Amino acid sequence: MPLNMNKYLTDAYTGGIIKKYPEDFIVEEITPEGIILEVGKSIEFKDEENWKGNYIHFTLEKRNWTTLDAIREIANRVGKQRKHFGFAGNKDKYAVTTQRVGCFNVKLEDLMKVKIKGIILRDFQKTNRKIRLGDLWGNRFTIRVREPELKGKELEEALNKLCKLKYFLNYYGVQRFGTTRPITHIVGRFIIERDWEGAFHAYCGTPLPYDDKKSKLARELVDEENFKEAYKKFPKAFFYERRMIKAYIETGSYQKAFMILPPYLRCMFINAYQSYLFNEIINRRFEYGFEPMEGDILIDNVPSGALFGYKTRFASGIQGEIEREIYERENLSPEDFKIGEFGSFIGDRRAMIGKIYNMKYWIEDDSYVLQFCLKKGNYATSVLREFIEKKD
């Protein structure tokens, strides 16, 4: 089940390697007010005069941490649960990233004492508001591409052509599906079909080439249904796999094993399946181009595609035909997206092309650096694929 990303806007490419080191991929959050949270730079955020003592915001700079793991570790250090913390969006793990984080009922002096390798907390602000998912304008990306296949004048010509791109195909990037284990959408499809056993084995079992030796052995044991031994063999870092296996051993129910996951993680599986089908919608629309056509539903004057749910708003015209054909092929119905206690998924629409802001590059030795800004919800890897993937 590939990730449905196979169309390109140009025939130019440079080749190359990204993320050799975390410092090669810098993600700096841009606040709703347009402030770029620059790596290594302190910014003053003024305290609210009528502070009621509830919320504190801070900038989290992290290296080689997921956002969720970083916040979980910070919460542990200050003696609070993760639910006391809020953030606007997840940032890449194998990268250097910045973002604002809000916390409730946490003492400032406790936050200021936190010292964790790869994590810096700064720019504290006393405020009366939460930070919710989506509370950002977007992100600035500074990405080093190492060992490009093209050199000298050829490289410069390709970069000049590619950097003229104003838009990109707004695919959901590989992070949506799992960078090392791109199976999240497969789990989601099993859940939509109410095949809880298949979903359990896809998530906890099903060894893949990039799995390390210990987790690969544990996943093989899951597929053999030797769950007690699999639980012992999974490294403790595989927190959710271990919890799910334990829940299955205790209850004998694959569905109940999924219910021990936090709501945001349960949502992730269905969202990934929706995203997988959305990527296919882009591929199907590609042959018609992305100029608005009769029947399109526009977002910011750009044609949008469906993220299927229990209240899917279909386009009409050619775009509507594409969406309904995929929906019917998958044997979907509104009720499929109402999954009881697991969650309900209303559906949405998403622009099929995204705008690139302030794109520039510079060449250094055997690498080049790209810098650009994207609005929230857009993936840098969907821009990068135009640069580094060979277009056959």
Swiss-Prot record:
UniProt enzyme class: isomerase
Keywords noted in UniProt: Isomerase, tRNA processing
GO MF assignments: pseudouridine synthase activity; RNA binding; tRNA pseudouridine(13) synthase activity
Coiled coil: none
Cross-referenced SUPFAM superfamilies: Pseudouridine synthase (SSF55120)
Entry-linked InterPro entries: PsdUridine_synth_cat_dom_sf (IPR020103), PsdUridine_synth_TruD (IPR001656), PsdUridine_synth_TruD_insert (IPR011760), TruD_catalytic (IPR042214)
Protein EC: 5.4.99.27
Limits of the TRUD domain: 167-354
Family annotation (CDD domains): PSTD1
Catalyzed reactions: uridine(13) in tRNA = pseudouridine(13) in tRNA
Sequence similarity: Belongs to the pseudouridine synthase TruD family.
Protein task: Could be responsible for synthesis of pseudouridine from uracil-13 in transfer RNAs.
Protein name: Probable tRNA pseudouridine synthase D 1
Species annotation: Methanocaldococcus jannaschii (strain ATCC 43067 / DSM 2661 / JAL-1 / JCM 10045 / NBRC 100440) (Methanococcus jannaschii)
GN (gene name): truD1
